[in-house]
Amino acid sequence: MTHVSRRKFLFTTGAAAAASILVHGCTSNGSQSATTGEQAPSAAPAANVSAANAPKVETTKAKLGFIPLTDAAPLIIAKEKGFFAKYGMTDIEVIKQKSWPVTRDNLKIGSSGGGIDGAHILSPMPYLMTINDKVPMYILARLNTNGQAISVAEKFKELNVNLESKSLKDAAIKAKADKKALKMGITFPGGTHDLWMRYWLAAGGINPDQDVVLEAVPPPQMVANMKVNTVDGFCVGEPWNAQLVNQKIGYSALVTGELWKDHPEKAFSMRQDWIEQNPNAAQAILMAILEAQQWCDKAENKEEMCKICSDRKYFNVAAADIIERAKGNIDYGDGRKEQNFAHRMKFWADNASYPYKSHDIWFLTEDIRWGYLPKDTKVQDIVNQVNKEDLWKKAAKAIGVADAEIPASSSRGVETFFDGVKFDPEKPEEYLNSLKIKKV
């Protein structure tokens, strides 16, 4: 079930029409997306709508995609609070996408073909697009760290399935023997949620390619699929894990920051050709997003952020499903609770926005591990091509970020995972060779 072509997209029975669009029409253009050009009633624009440091832009227009996930907030806030307009990008469209494959396909055709120019995106996707789809992409920023979860059905409470997946191993083996293999939802093959799920399962001795079935499911459909027992568990971003708990359908075994503290998650990425044609506009967009990330990370703005994002044209969920985990208050749904948790989603704090190349090296190494990329992939070369940390630094300085607050290194150093495994970005081959369960 590793290859993209063999993945299925799961929906509830009532979403059959949407399933047909996604499975049979993935090359469709922006007509599948709901444009969110209008202003939310609660959002006042930024006071300064003509910043002195705004670059002289080549165009005021760009189409940016997002999936309804809390970590898309910087794009939504940049639109609704007037940060895009502040830096001269007065005609930005922030456009809802139905799934990550739709995001990919709309990026492939670009806005000139009815698609989009950039997006809130799973961090590995720009690499998969650049390598596999031959659509050169640039990563301009990391949108957040942490903020995802692996949630499972209520039936697993008695097994005490949590940070350690080994308690699930016997159930997985039995289900496979009964020809009813456990199905675990992920959002995109080779994307972050897929990699978190695979790492967690493998750490507990469960082979994700042999012992369970991984199914690609659009994030907003995760809870519905759990409700009708189409999936037994899933890995997705918020607010869908919180919604699952609030509806008492399942519980969160873990939040992903427990797997890897302050792990990188979503990125802001744009087509390389668009950036090369509009370098000043790209800088203006990036400046606006960085400022929005700073705004989103302030405690006093969380309520407003969640209210804006909950709107029908964005997430179309109750603000109550977003706010608590956005604040770092985690109700796992099985009696465990955390307040102001250290593993909360971060947009700016602790260099959350900086696109460390060392993190992208890990993503590519994991995609090699699971067969999404060939073993001979020139990892460092492709990271240097796609990751534009230099543009991040330029934009950060332009909005007044002090030099002391800008990372001096492309690497965050050696990373340690929950199971004690270490990843040295200087020695990715050693890490890969040390892993017991893998496809290569």
UniProtKB/Swiss-Prot annotation:
Q: Where is the lipid attached (S-diacylglycerol cysteine)?
A: C26
Report any one BP term from Gene Ontology.
Answer: monoatomic ion transport
Q: Which residues bind nitrate?
A: W100, Q148, H193, G237, K266
Q: How does it sit in the membrane?
A: Lipid-anchor
Per UniProt, the ranges with Low complexity bias are 40-51
Query: Transmembrane ranges?
Result: none
Q: Where in the cell is it found?
A: Cell inner membrane
Segment forming the signal sequence? 1-25
Query: What S-S linkages are listed for this chain?
Result: none
> What job does this protein perform?
Part of the ABC transporter complex NrtABCD involved in nitrate uptake. The complex is probably also involved in nitrite transport. NrtA is the substrate-binding protein.
Highest taxon above the source species: Bacteria
Protein name listed in UniProt? Nitrate/nitrite binding protein NrtA
Task: Quote the SUPFAM superfamilies the UniProt record gives.
Answer: Periplasmic binding protein-like II
Q: Which InterPro entries match?
A: NrtA/CpmA_ABC-bd_dom, TAT_signal
State the family it belongs to: Belongs to the CmpA/NrtA family.
Q: Which UniProt keywords apply?
A: Cell inner membrane, Cell membrane, Ion transport, Lipoprotein, Membrane, Nitrate assimilation, Palmitate, Signal, Transport
Q: Where is this region: Disordered?
A: 30-51
Pfam families for the chain: NMT1_2 (PF13379)
Quick one: where's the N-palmitoyl cysteine lipidation?
A: C26
> How does this polypeptide assemble, per the annotation?
The complex is composed of two ATP-binding proteins (NrtC and NrtD), two transmembrane proteins (NrtB) and a solute-binding protein (NrtA).
Q: Composition bias, kind Polar residues: at what positions?
A: 30-39
